[in-house]
Regions:
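Conserved cytochrome P450 K-helix E-x-x-R motif and the immediately C-terminal K′/meander segment
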Residues: 138-158, 335, 339, 430-471
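Cytochrome P450 catalytic-core helices
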Residues: 395-420
Length: 505
């Protein structure tokens, strides 16, 4: 019989040798590891910067953090090279197929963490811009400039300030350490806005991006396995084929002296790449082959953007032409994804080896579904395929467009990047060996610098799931936290003399 002081955290059969397993105990992230016949349960966040240790790997008897490579002994939890830094290792109890930890020890762990936390202040004590009665600051935030307005207010009121958006109390965070703290406390303390998740479900993009809690953990495990390094390597020839198509389009335009719409072409490029990777369909929108499927896919991001900024969810009361177009597109996409899912299931049945080497993301999801380790429905499959399509199109296209913009502004940088690409790519202008991509060091650095200045998501909006504190400020359940990810990186640091708002390698 198991004593009442023990809390069940996992089934032992879920724990494979040398594969970290993500656990949750009353909202506390943990990680379980089985190595050399010994099962250990540790605190789940790396003490360095809070990375989720379950996303790491076991190498030579050490649990390696996915963030910055800190290594912890699988038996003791001590950090390699710094034994003073040690993960908390919980006492465990195993009965039949169940793995337990001591509830009293978990409470003591919480108490020690709480004892080191500073005394919190109420949200109302923060400064903030004046607003209107009832509406607060709602009408001061124009959607197209929202991140710029919030950053300007951070310059005025400091890295932590408050807003009132109608009935919602908002804490705006521009302090990088506090932003990071909020991120690492997802999904148990903070979630994405419930309103956005509901809209994503309505447009058919209900996947890991909108999932929360245990559902997020379940879907994340499956989707990360379906996005493994092997799948990316297998997809590489298709990526180069589509890249060559874009290159050819631009070469023809240059020879004819025609201008190109850079963002439109890059959006077509990312649509072709993402659809080929997601479900194996090369839509070839670069050459203008706008078939039914590409038109249907185009309706989803438009509807998501339109509904995300709407003041009221009017579409739940009546339908406008754009909403009817979405309904028609969703019906077609649902049928297409159901057919592709059935095809993937049949292909794996005919060639079981595809389960270990799927040729696209959808096939990888179906392989994980058939393995049966995690409950994963056909709706989960289609929702995560649509999530990948949304995540891979417009944001990637804009990031590439900004990189090219900065490159064109700086002829010296352009010459450097061209020199590196010529050295790596040769006369063909395309990368032929997947193993060569790490040699493009300057190009990768330039991409990171462009995303520092122009990140695809300069604001992350979270909602408190229960009463909590953030940055020493009390946040009641339902309060919102707007995280500004760009602000600190574009402001000059005292005394360094650098222009932080300028592109600089």
């Amino acid at each position: 019989m198991t004593p009442p002081s023990w809390l069940r955290v996992a089934r032992l059969s879920e724990l494979a040798d040398d594969v970290p397993l993500s656990l949750d105990a009353d909202g506390t992230p943990l990680v379980a590891v089985r190595h050399a016949g010994t099962v250990s349960v540790f605190e789940g966040l790396c003490p360095h910067q809070g990375s989720l240790l379950a996303d790491g790997q076991v190498v030579a008897g050490q649990l390696v953090c996915p963030g910055h490579g800190w290594r912890f002994d699988c038996a003791s939890g001590r950090r390699a090279g710094d034994p003073a830094t040690c993960l908390h290792r919980f006492d465990t109890h195993i009965a039949d197929d169940a793995l337990y930890i001591d509830v009293d020890e978990l409470r003591a762990f919480h108490a020690r963490r709480a004892a080191h936390a500073p005394t919190a202040r109420p949200l109302a004590s923060l400064p903030g811009p004046d607003g209107l009665p009832l509406f607060g600051n709602l009408f001061q935030l124009r959607e197209t400039r929202q991140h710029l307005i919030l950053e300007q207010w951070a310059d005025t009121f400091g890295p932590l300030y408050r807003l009132q958006l109608g009935p919602y109390r908002v804490m705006v965070v521009a302090d990088p350490a506090v932003v990071q703290d909020a991120f690492k406390r997802r999904p148990d303390t903070f979630r994405r806005l419930g309103r956005f998740a509901a809209i994503a479900r309505e447009v058919g993009a209900d996947g890991v991006f909108t999932a929360e809690g245990d559902d997020w953990r379940r879907q994340r495990k499956v989707t990360t396995q379906a996005l493994g390094h092997g799948q990316l390597k297998h997809f590489f020839p298709a990526l180069m084929r589509i890249t060559g198509r874009l290159r050819g389009r631009w070469e023809r335009a240059a020879d004819a002296g025609h201008e190109v719409d850079l963002l439109d072409d890059l959006t077509r490029f990312t649509i072709d790449v993402t659809s080929a990777f997601a479900f194996g369909e090369d839509l070839n929108t670069i050459d203008g082959h706008a078939g039914t499927l590409s038109r249907q896919l185009n309706e989803v991001p438009k509807a998501l953007s339109r509904r995300a900024i709407a003041m009221l969810p009017y579409w739940r009361l009546f339908r406008l032409p754009a909403d009817r177009a979405l309904d028609e597109a969703r019906e077609g996409l649902t049928a297409t994804l159901a057919r592709l899912t059935d095809d993937a299931r049949r292909q794996i049945a005919e060639d079981p080896g595809l389960a270990a080497r799927p040729v696209n993301y959808l096939q990888g999801l179906v392989a994980q579904q058939l393995a049966g380790e995690h409950a994963f429905s056909d709706e989960n499959v289609s929702g995560n395929v649509m999530t990948l399509m949304l995540a891979g199109e417009e944001t990637t296209a804009r990031a590439l467009a900004w990189l090219i913009y900065y490159m064109c502004e700086k002829p010296g940088l352009q010459a450097q990047l061209r020199g590196e690409s010529d050295a790596v790519l040769g006369e063909s202008g395309l990368l032929h060996d997947f193993a060569d991509h790490p040699r493009m060091v300057l190009i990768e650095a330039a991409a990171h610098e462009a995303m520092r200045l122009k990140p695809p998501a300069p604001i992350h909006r979270l909602e408190a799931l229960h009463d909590t504190t953030l940055g020493g400020i009390e946040l009641p359940k339902g309060a919102l936290a707007f995280l500004l990810t760009r602000h600190a990186t574009t402001r000059e640091q005292a005394g360094d003399g650098a222009d932080a708002d300028a592109f600089d390698l």
